[in-house]
Amino acid sequence: MSAASRRWVAADGAHLDVRGLKPPEPMVAILSMIDGGAEKTAFTVHLERDPVFLYPELVERGWIATPVDADPGEVRLRLERAR
């Protein structure tokens, strides 16, 4: 995978793949997507590891993360604006 995040839209909504990026680039890419308003309500992120430092940042911005089924060696989270 290249050293850049990938975005696409599937039947279940928008996706952001940050696998292959070195910390803190995955968190920066995810927060940029939220802060920039690219996704207003929800999207799925694909990561290599559990983003423990991301969770407090999401709470601060009014978002929640829910784990979803993923391939072995992948962490997949559905990020949604808290209601």
Stretches found by the model and what they are:
Residues 62-83:
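C-terminal edge-of-domain segments
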Residues 43-64, 69:
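Short, structured protein-protein interaction patches enriched in aromatics and acidic/basic residues
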